[in-house]
């Protein structure tokens, strides 16, 4: 049977539709996203603020930047920066300390909501002097393309979340490491030395729990790719399960994935060998990331435990202020507590701008 012109056109149309469908997959569904773009311009909230138009003259988009090896990332997921970059002092100290500890690599701070760089406060002006410390926008409609997470699923999860800033940070952190590798940190650390003594690691905040507040992934290794891929796939496959853990979502994901990979129930039994070369770093007091565990009040002391403080500075890579707890405690300048001593040594530029309280 000889194909008619009409049949040929039908076949061609079918191929065209198939090509369109295949090329469109993975792109944001703009028609679906429209309902999240109903913005209260005075008081934008997550996730709507992530879909606001942003001024490329203020910050470039991270997807257009060539990421270097051993980059350290921070995620700032609040909506409060559109009228000026309102980073607090402790965040700024975290960024400066990371920049000082890694002079040969880059520290990138990522913002999914619009940011205005006009008239920054003095402590932010200090940060802008570091050539290896840079701020970037994250276009969430673009950022998730080609990853195990779909942008619309991320937006819908954040719309339902009672812990949106924390959970957005967790998902964006994992996706960033899936795309680029490197180290991702919460902004309540003070970094004391290089975070690249090892590759592919997570820390134990206590003897019974992991923390993704600091996570290193080398995507050029099989185990690094496996761990981060499994964590993102877990989010995509079980969004409701991930959401129920609130601000502990990252910890819950890491626990489930590492139990599966290491075939052990308890973190203390997860050796490098059992985990295929992935490092589960020890808990306090041996931890290089959480040397005081959950005892954040330690940093509000000054004379007690001086030997412990000096040992911590000598041995640890970084210290965690446990921001969700310590944020309610102000530290007065001039009290000479341990946090102020850390700030004077590891973020002196930011420290020099502080007049009253950290």
Regions found by a protein language model. Give the residues of each.
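Small-residue hinge/turn detector
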Residues: 171-182
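Glycosyltransferase-associated regions of secretory-pathway enzymes
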Residues: 2-169, 187-358
């Amino acid at each position: 049977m000889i194909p008619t012109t009409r049949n040929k056109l039908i076949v061609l149309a079918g191929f065209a539709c198939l090509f369109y469908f295949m090329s469109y997959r993975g792109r944001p569904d703009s028609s679906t996203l429209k309902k999240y773009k109903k913005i209260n311009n005075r008081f934008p909230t997550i996730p709507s603020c992530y879909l606001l138009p942003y001024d490329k003259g203020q910050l470039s988009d991270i997807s257009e930047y060539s990421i270097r090896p051993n980059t350290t990332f921070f995620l700032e997921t609040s909506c409060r920066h559109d009228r000026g970059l309102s980073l607090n002092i402790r965040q700024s100290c975290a960024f400066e300390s990371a920049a000082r500890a890694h002079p040969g690599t880059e520290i990138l701070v990522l913002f999914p909501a619009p940011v205005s760089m006009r008239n920054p406060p003095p402590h932010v002006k200090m940060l802008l002097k570091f050539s290896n410390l840079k701020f970037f926008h994250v276009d969430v409609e673009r950022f998730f393309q080609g990853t195990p997470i779909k942008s619309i699923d991320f937006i819908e999860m954040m719309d339902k979340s009672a812990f949106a800033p924390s959970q957005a940070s967790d998902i964006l952190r994992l996706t960033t490491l899936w795309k680029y590798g490197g180290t991702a940190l919460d902004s309540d650390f003070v970094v004391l030395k290089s975070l690249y003594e090892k590759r592919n690691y997570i820390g134990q905040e206590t003897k019974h729990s992991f923390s993704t507040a600091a996570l290193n992934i080398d995507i050029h290794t099989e185990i690094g790719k496996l761990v981060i891929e499994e964590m993102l796939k877990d989010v995509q496959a079980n969004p409701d399960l991930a959401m129920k853990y609130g601000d502990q979502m990252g910890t819950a994901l890491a626990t489930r994935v590492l139990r599966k990979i290491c075939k052990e129930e308890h973190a203390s039994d997860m050796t490098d060998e059992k985990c295929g070369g992935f490092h589960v770093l020890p808990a306090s007091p041996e931890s290089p990331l959480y040397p005081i565990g959950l005892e954040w009040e330690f940093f509000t002391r000054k004379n007690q435990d001086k030997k412990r403080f000096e040992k911590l500075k000598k041995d640890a890579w970084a210290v965690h202020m446990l921001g969700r707890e310590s944020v309610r405690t102000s530290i007065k300048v001039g009290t000479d507590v341990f946090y102020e001593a850390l700030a004077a040594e590891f973020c002196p530029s930011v420290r020099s701008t502080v007049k009253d309280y950290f």
